[in-house]
UniProtKB/Swiss-Prot annotation:
The modification N6-(pyridoxal phosphate)lysine is found at residue 270. Pfam families: Aminotran_3. GO terms for molecular function: glutamate-1-semialdehyde 2,1-aminomutase activity; pyridoxal phosphate binding; transaminase activity. Its EC number is 5.4.3.8. This is Glutamate-1-semialdehyde 2,1-aminomutase 1. Pathway: Porphyrin-containing compound metabolism; protoporphyrin-IX biosynthesis; 5-aminolevulinate from L-glutamyl-tRNA(Glu): step 2/2. InterPro entries: 4pyrrol_synth_GluAld_NH2Trfase, Aminotrans_3, Aminotrans_3_PPA_site, PyrdxlP-dep_Trfase, PyrdxlP-dep_Trfase_major, PyrdxlP-dep_Trfase_small. Keywords: Cytoplasm, Isomerase, Porphyrin biosynthesis, Pyridoxal phosphate. It is found in: Cytoplasm. One of its GO terms (cellular component) is cytoplasm. Homodimer. Coiled coil: none annotated. Belongs to the class-III pyridoxal-phosphate-dependent aminotransferase family. HemL subfamily.
């Protein structure tokens, strides 16, 4: 298959004249996969994309996770259309937001109270504010490599040591803010304990991806999350789960429900919006009552709880309640995993594959991936070549070695079979060019 990107290239050239970097999120650029014009999509339906040149793709990007029910799902599309016809924004309470809040609470028992915002970044940012208000402390802990949005406090990477006060990971983030963040490696209890022994009395909360999604799919070691809860609570701090990626991705509910570990606060986004902008946060009643108008922690938003996003979210959860959907995602994920591993062995390509149900990551390495350091130490150049080869095969992946492949409820066994064949051809090409 020879895929041409003439119109995408022309559109990107034009975009560079008007949009910073030609993209509205840096993750959409092809900088991490060797450069070039990113492919511009024109429409999506089910598990498929069509770009501006008319090329068709099987989509494993799923908009970085939200599109679990596939593109333009009729039930969700109808709900959005109805909401739009009734007016997309009121600036008042609505019945839709109450219904949606109840649905989230029923699905995730740790949510005594919830509040809607407009993005995962907002949700995480506000849980931090609430935790600080509740504890009277200022420092935050996070795990290296875990992305929690682009607000100043969480755009922090680890410094030179295994546990350290943070250094800014972006220009424009003051060192004074970064020093409020303590970064430790994921899946390492001893380093976490050392950091809490040193700074625990200053820590308001720890941010946790219960299943990591931002340096690939990485599961916690057995007992790790339970130990995090124990140590953090002993220090008098709160546990915040960032479930922006994980909630409703692996089961109807949160990763916390799948794993049986309960946080104090939870941040949500992505899947719960059915493809429209959304965020939410919630948790224990006594903590959430710190939020205005009941408490002193201020948070507001003109678009928060807007009818279109509420309707889309309700419809998405209604679809996900259908029997057998998550079992299908797991079955297709297992089929894809098996096929990719077989092709890697056949063509003598070194990979490690991490999968949980309908999400997986292919790393070009022989090492086990349990933390960010291991994920960094993988072959990004090889991934970039693989990514470009897969585009030529009509397979759309995220343009980064750190990102997951996301299955949707609309993928079929035939899609998986074709994808495995495409992986085989890509691996053969890589093997011939070693």
């Amino acid at each position: 298959m020879v895929v041409k990107f003439t119109k995408s290239e022309a559109l990107h050239k034009e975009a560079l004249e008007h949009i910073v970097g030609g993209v509205n999120s840096p993750s959409r650029s092809f900088k991490a996969v060797g450069g070039g014009a990113p492919v511009a999509m024109e429409r999506g339906k089910g598990a498929y994309f069509w770009d501006v040149d008319g090329n068709k793709y099987i989509d494993y990007l799923a908009a970085y996770g939200p599109i679990i029910t596939g593109h333009a799902h009729p039930h969700i599309t109808k709900a959005i259309t109805t909401a739009a016809e009734n007016g997309v924004l009121y600036g008042t309470p609505t019945a839709l937001e109450v219904k949606f809040a109840k649905m989230l609470k029923e699905a995730m028992p740790a949510l005594d109270k919830v509040r809607f915002v407009n993005s995962g970044t907002e949700a995480v940012m506000t849980t931090i504010r609430v935790a600080r208000a509740y504890t009277g402390r200022t420092k935050i802990m996070k795990f290296a490599g875990c992305y929690h949005g682009h607000s100043d406090l969480v755009l922090v990477a680890a410094g030179s040591g295994p546990s350290t006060l943070g250094t800014p990971d972006s220009a424009g983030v003051p060192q004074s803010i970064a020093q409020e963040v303590i970064t430790v490696p994921f899946n390492n209890v001893e380093t976490l304990k050392e950091a809490l022994d040193k700074w625990g009395h200053e820590v308001a909360a720890i941010l946790v991806e219960p299943i990591v999604g931002n340096f690939g799919i990485v599961e916690p070691k057995p007992g790790f999350l339970e130990k995090v809860n124990e140590l953090v609570h002993e220090a008098g701090a709160l546990v915040i789960y960032d479930e922006v990626i994980t909630a409703f991705r692996f089961m109807y509910g949160g990763a916390q429900d799948l794993l049986g570990v309960t946080p104090d606060l939870t941040a949500l986004g992505k899947v719960i919006g059915g493809g429209l902008p959304i965020g939410a946060y919630g948790g224990k009643k006594e903590i959430m009552e710190q939020v205005a108008p009941l408490g002193p922690a201020y948070q507001a938003g003109t678009m928060a709880g807007n009818p279109a996003s509420m309707a889309s979210g309700i419809a998405c959860l209604e679809v996900l309640q259908q029997e057998g959907l998550y079992e299908k995602l797991d079955e297709l994920g297992a089929m894809l995993e098996k096929g990719i591993l077989e092709q890697a062995e056949k063509h003598n390509i070194d990979i490690t594959l991490n999968r949980l149900k309908g999400a997986l990551t292919v790393y070009f390495t022989t090492n086990t991936i349990e933390d960010y350091d291991a994920a960094q130490d993988t072959d990004g150049e090889m991934f970039g070549k693989f990514f470009k080869l897969m585009l030529q095969e009509g397979i759309n992946l995220a343009p980064s070695k750190y990102e997951a492949w996301f299955l949707t409820t609309e993928h079929t066994k035939e899609d998986i079979e074709y994808t495995i064949e495409a992986v085989g051809r890509a691996f053969a090409a890589l093997a011939n060019n070693k």
